[in-house]
From Swiss-Prot:
This is Ribosomal protein uS12 methylthiotransferase RimO. It catalyses: L-aspartate(89)-[ribosomal protein uS12]-hydrogen + (sulfur carrier)-SH + AH2 + 2 S-adenosyl-L-methionine = 3-methylsulfanyl-L-aspartate(89)-[ribosomal protein uS12]-hydrogen + (sulfur carrier)-H + 5'-deoxyadenosine + L-methionine + A + S-adenosyl-L-homocysteine + 2 H(+). Binds 2 [4Fe-4S] clusters. One cluster is coordinated with 3 cysteines and an exchangeable S-adenosyl-L-methionine. InterPro entries: Elp3/MiaA/NifB-like_rSAM, Methylthiotransferase, Methylthiotransferase_CS, Methylthiotransferase_N, Methylthiotransferase_N_sf, NA-bd_OB-fold, Ribosomal_uS12_MeSTrfase_RimO, rSAM. One of its GO terms (cellular component) is cytosol. Its EC number is 2.8.4.4. One of its GO terms (biological process) is tRNA modification. [4Fe-4S] cluster 1 binds at C19, C55, C84. Residues 138-379 form the Radical SAM core domain. Keywords: 4Fe-4S, Cytoplasm, Iron, Iron-sulfur, Metal-binding, S-adenosyl-L-methionine, Transferase. It comes from Mannheimia succiniciproducens (strain KCTC 0769BP / MBEL55E). It is found in: Cytoplasm. Catalyzes the methylthiolation of an aspartic acid residue of ribosomal protein uS12.
């Protein structure tokens, strides 16, 4: 007769807030938890401990994080806090003194030490063989975020990221490429390259290290962004770049896009167009030069999609400054644009600047900005009608098929609604050809 002993692994609840960079941190912590034998559950009720990975970028994010911590304490009582807001331990303790432990962002080892302290590591681990080679992922199986560096060396006056996440710290190129290959080998069709400042990759390293030859897959490579992108382009997946600061060497990425090595998509946070406002933000700013570069980029790669973000209502922004921004939008004809009303952030230099813009003026400028950009976006999407585009499928239900074109990043851009008239077998993650038949200011419609 055989006797089987039951095994119950400790349960860990997990709450992940914030941006894609924080999501990558959550994925790494979850991977280590599973590797150590813990069971991850989606509820507070049966959790032996709850981890809350917080965001602290703007005040509304801080409030959301504090509320999430409070909810976890109320529902469970045993809470460890990590993430960006964790860098402000006193602020958390003032509101939630019963939190067990607090760590800052990307403090993976410290988080695991705290978990082991309150919920000892299981002696027997039935999950080791179940942890996939690419680690635990919180995104759908067909796309994943690839974080290439941590921190930021810029001192933008509206931002506190350097104080939360530290100075720029680039990952070794072979480590990034190894992770990317594991992801693609696991079935990932699209890699979204993220960091606080993607175009600064490897600039924190000495010239000697940047020029040092290393080997990956038997090929000699250098440690820089262009080489990284060129090698990523050999993996057979869509490679999409986010958070690209407009350094001069970004120009060298455009030929790779024209050659089809990486997606013709550039996410560049320009923030404003008024030289005065840009100077106050401590952002680089020659509008004429930016426009010249955009024109050149489009000449080299006509299919290029440009996404950017802007801030309206920054302290000292006058109507003249705002009009410069509108004029820039009209001339630049950007494809995808996000706009934020300036929000004071504790610890940011701009929070204490003179000439704060009244909230009603911010709102009015936001509405005017969005109205103009919606017209521009609609006009640019109209130009896609009649074309046949590759579309990656994100969702299939009784209402139809939803995907994204090369011009659409998940969560932040538009989608493509697909009518499967051919009734061909289509699965989530497939990349199919779609004939575009209609468009509005955000989305496309088409048939396959």
């Amino acid at each position: 007769m055989r006797y089987f002993m039951s095994y119950s692994a400790p349960n860990i609840g997990f709450v992940s807030l914030g941006c894609p960079k924080n999501l990558v941190d959550s994925e790494r912590i979850l991977t280590e938890l599973r590797t150590d034998g813990y069971n991850i559950i989606p509820t507070y009720e049966n959790a032996d401990l709850v981890i809350v990975n917080t965001c602290g970028f703007i005040d509304s994010a801080v409030q959301e994080s504090l509320e999430a911590i409070g909810e976890a304490l109320e529902e469970n009582g045993k809470v460890i806090v990590t993430g960006c807001l964790g860098a402000k331990e006193n602020q958390i303790r003032e509101v939630h003194p019963k939190v067990l432990e607090i760590t800052g962002p990307h403090s993976y080892e410290a988080v695991m030490e705290h978990v082991h302290k309150y919920v000892p590591r299981p002696e027997r681990n039935p999950y080791t063989s179940l942890v996939p080679a690419q680690g635990v992922k919180l995104t759908p199986k067909h796309y994943a975020y690839l974080k290439i560096s941590e921190g930021c060396d810029h001192k933008c006056t509206f931002c506190i990221i350097p104080s939360l996440r530290g100075d720029l710290d680039s990952r070794p190129i072979t480590q990034v490429l190894d992770e990317a290959k594991r992801l693609v080998d696991s079935g990932v069709k699209e890699l979204l390259v993220v960091s606080q400042d993607t175009s600064a990759y490897a600039l924190d390293q000495s010239k000697e290290n940047q020029n040092k030859t290393v080997f990956w897959n038997g090929a000699p490579i250098k440690n820089n962004l262009i080489t990284l992108c060129r090698q990523l382009g050999t993996l057979g997946a869509w490679i999409r770049l986010h958070y690209v600061y407009p350094y001069p060497h970004v120009d060298d990425l455009i030929p790779l896009m024209a050659e089809g090595k990486i997606l013709p998509y550039l996410d560049i946070p320009l923030q404003h167009a008024s030289p005065k406002v840009l100077k106050a933000m401590k952002r680089p700013g020659s509008v004429e030069r930016v426009l010249e570069r955009i024109q050149k980029w489009r000449e080299i790669c006509p299919e290029l999609t440009l996404r950017s973000t802007f801030i309206v209502g920054f302290p000292g922004e006058t109507e003249e400054d705002f009009q410069m921004l509108l004029d820039f939008l009209q001339e630049a004809q950007l494809d995808r644009v996000g706009c934020f009303k300036f929000s004071p952030v504790e610890g940011a230099v701009a929070t204490d600047m003179a000439d704060q813009v009244p909230e009603e003026v911010k709102e009015q400028r936001f509405q005017r900005f969005m109205e103009l950009q919606q017209q521009i976006s609609a006009q640019r999407l109209q130009q896609k009608i009649g074309k046949t585009l590759p579309v990656i499928i994100d969702d299939i239900d009784e209402d139809g098929i939803i995907g994204r074109s090369m011009a659409d990043a998940p969560e932040i851009d538009g989608v493509v609604y697909v009518d499967n008239r051919s009734e061909s077998a289509v699965k989530i993650g497939d990349i199919i050809q779609v004939a575009i038949t209609n468009a509005d200011e955000y989305d496309l419609w088409g048939t396959c």
